[in-house]
């Protein structure tokens, strides 16, 4: 049982409804965005590879930018959306997600899906790190050398949907754990 499951059980003793992502929101597959499209400034962009190597559970700033002309043809990411990777060289990394909490629309490209929803974005991004999600994505993944979980397949993933106030309380607790863990790691490395 994950920490999220424990918190849901504690905060919602009557249980919660599980719903497919495709019912909770809309999953929009990105298209094309090689790193050669990056510019010094312009429209914020998150490349799927950066979700593995640079971003944590959420972010308010992008590391990369593309021209407005390039951005016009890419998948739009609005504040509160979650970007989920579709492709990886291993099962562990496919489906890694980052919640976009910035104040402007940004873009993403291929090998990523934008999840547009009305839930707490950080709750979704945290839930996409759970063993429950891992078990479901394992069944939906295809490929051997390159693993893929399509946007269509992600629509079938079922997740718990507690009330928004419970989602926010779970996020508050998990954020606190994340902060404490980072502080402890910093002290151990010092």
Regions found by a protein language model. Name each.
Residues 10, 32-33, 70-71, 101, ...:
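Short, solvent-exposed loop/turn positions at domain surfaces
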Residues 104-106, 187-190:
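Short amphipathic alpha-helical linker/capping segments at the junctions of internal repeats
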Residues 1-11, 82:
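Accessory (non-catalytic) regions of SAM-dependent nucleic-acid methyltransferases
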Residues 47, 69-131:
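A short beta-sheet element
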Residues 7-31, 190:
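Non-catalytic DNA-recognition/assembly elements of restriction-modification systems
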Residues 105-111, 142-162:
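A short glycine-rich beta-alpha junction/loop motif
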Residues 15-17, 155-189:
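Amphipathic alpha-helical segments
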Residues 22-35, 49-81:
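Sequence-specific dsDNA recognition surfaces
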């Amino acid at each position: 049982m994950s920490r999220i499951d424990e918190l849901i059980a504690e905060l919602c003793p009557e249980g919660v409804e599980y719903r497919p992502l495709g019912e909770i929101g809309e999953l929009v597959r990105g298209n094309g965005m090689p790193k050669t499209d990056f510019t010094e400034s312009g429209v914020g962009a998150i490349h799927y590879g950066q979700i593995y190597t640079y971003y944590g559970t959420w972010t308010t700033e992008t590391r990369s930018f593309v021209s407005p002309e390039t951005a016009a043809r890419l998948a739009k990411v609005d504040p509160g959306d979650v970007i989920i990777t579709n492709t990886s060289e291993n099962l562990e990394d496919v489906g890694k997600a980052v919640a976009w909490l910035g104040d402007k629309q940004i873009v993403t490209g291929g090998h990523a899906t934008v999840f547009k929803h009305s839930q707490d974005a950080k709750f979704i991004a945290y839930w996409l790190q759970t063993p429950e999600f891992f078990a479901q994505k394992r069944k939906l993944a295809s490929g051997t050398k390159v693993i893929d979980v399509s946007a269509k397949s992600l629509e079938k993933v079922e997740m718990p949907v507690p009330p928004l106030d419970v989602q926010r309380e779970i996020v508050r607790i998990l954020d606190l754990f994340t902060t404490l863990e980072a502080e402890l790691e910093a002290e151990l490395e010092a």
